[in-house]
């Protein structure tokens, strides 16, 4: 079965009886889409046993696709071809690059960022692009303290995991999808 944001909003919630299902967000970053800033994506994630195992995040404005699958790897596909992805090792001596939501900044988030070891740079982006920049090795940490929906995170989560990264709850446990 597939669960999509728009179908849930319309009251159509499929029964998840097996261990595998799709999470789809055909327009992640609605605020960014309305602002016409290009920071919106199409997200498709496959979840098995509560964990994203494959994902695709597509940014129509730049015709860029990030894909990843457990045990296979992660890639960015754009006009320059295919690039294999790997998260970078955070260098706390040089300072972390933090990427956070452009639309969901809060005093709690700012306090969290202020308490990180050493922040060299803070970037704001919309939608699942934050996951993609982590997988691309352009950022180290994406803190998200405000509520979010599973269709917003599953695809990007799969890409980050396939690139060698982790997605965790604020207490350090793996983020699970139920």
Residue ranges and their predicted role:
Residues 8, 37, 58, 71, ...:
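Residue-level structural signal for beta-strand termini and adjacent loop
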